Amino acid sequence: MGDYLLLIDGSSLLSTQYFGNLPREILYAKKQEEKEAWYHKIMMTSKGVYTNGIFGFLRYLFKIIKEQKPAYLAVAWDLTRDTFRRELYADYKGNRSETPEPLREQFALCQEVLANMGICQLMDEHFEADDLCGSMAKKFESQLPVKILTKDNDYLQLVTDNTTLWLMHSTAEKTQEIFDKYHMKKEDMAIPDRVFPFNPQLVEEEFGIEPCHVNSLKGLAGDKSDNITGVPGVGAVSAVKLIKEYGTVEKLYEAIDNLDKAGEKAIKEYWKEKLDLKRSPLAYLLKESDTELVGKKAAFLSEKLATIKTDIPITEPLEHFRTHIDKAAAQKELDRLEFHSVRLDFDEEEQPSVFETLELERVEDMNESFEVIRALKKEKTLGLSFAGTKDNIVGMAVAAGTKGYYFPVINFITEDLLTGFADELAASCKTMYVPDAKQFLHYMTDHK
């Protein structure tokens, strides 16, 4: 792949891993008190420190470092919602619920762990993670390729010929749908699991506009996830057509401001014929109010809120972000967090385990899990490994020849179900390899 700079939205990745590794009881609980009643089942250390998000974060990070081998690496964080955007609009992200306490506790701890390992991090109370990544990309993309890893599609506006967005999806199936749509093969690309790589051409094909106009699109259509209103009355389809035609909110209003009745009629007719806008949004775009955020005022404010900054001063040279992990310090952190199943395996001369050389297919559906286990019971030789802390199982990996599967503890796939599967497989196969026999027996005995 060659040298490149990898920028990771740490807040996005940690949150994704937290929710992806929650007990099913919390995922399906409707009321907050019902969720809190099951907090004791969240993965934690023997001292009661929540670690499920960090566990997934580090596993994912180590896998990327081993397989994608970024020459340079930085993790960016949101520290607060009270950034400069709240100064522009007090209700920015005002529709979001409070961060769950078990997740909130893990942000500072994850940042501390990464710092102790020697991984470069970016954080500033006045800016968001995307602003820091945007400024890093702008500074260094002329020197080498940049990859940005996140689940947030706001980052699409940063995509250029030398900056690729690795957009994460919640399931492998959703990712595969996009690969199939564009007749692309993931196997031909060196990218992480559940990620689709967006370049400028793919952004335009998927969203109908160039990357540099994504913020302007949100200026008209808004963004519910960030409580950005856009222009009330202007829908997403109309917004795409208008931005594709005019490029920016400013240029759109240059075309429609100060029109007389004849001019308004003419532009409505033009939009109808050229842009196929059967219901003209002109009245909504020109609406004015002293009490409501509408029309031009809403459009310009929304565009500004949606614009990722790319001009934050980055004083460190590229070499400062050279990928390096202090392996002794990292192992100390893994021991502190009681992550006995997470391995540091970055050096090519080291012999990786079977699970680190296989692309594991994630199995999250209970019915599918039974089907896969039935097929695996026909194999004579298997490799099996549990993932988790000292006392909690968060998943199980099974390898058979060149195929591998990962069963996370999620939805109706429980710890007891996985140990039951392990029992069945151990009884059916002739030979079973387990990387950590002591830990394997501990899990099996504890969940009888």
What are these regions (language model features)?
Residues 1-74, 84-85:
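Non-catalytic, usually N-terminal nucleic-acid engagement modules in DNA/RNA processing proteins
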Residues 14-20, 156-161, 396, 437-448:
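Short active-site loop/helix that positions an aromatic residue
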Residues 29, 80-107:
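A charged helix-plus-loop insertion that forms the helical arch/lid used to bind
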Residues 40-44, 94-314:
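Extended two-metal-dependent nuclease catalytic cores across DNA- and RNA-processing enzymes
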Residues 57-69, 135-139, 415-429:
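Short, basic/hydrophobic alpha-helical segments
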Residues 65-76, 80, 145-157, 161, ...:
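Structured, non-catalytic alpha/beta "coupling" segments that mediate domain-domain communication
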Residues 120, 174-218, 358-359, 397-448:
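Active-site-proximal helix-loop-helix substrate-binding element of RNase H-like nuclease domains
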Residues 319-426, 430-431:
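Long, highly charged low-complexity segments
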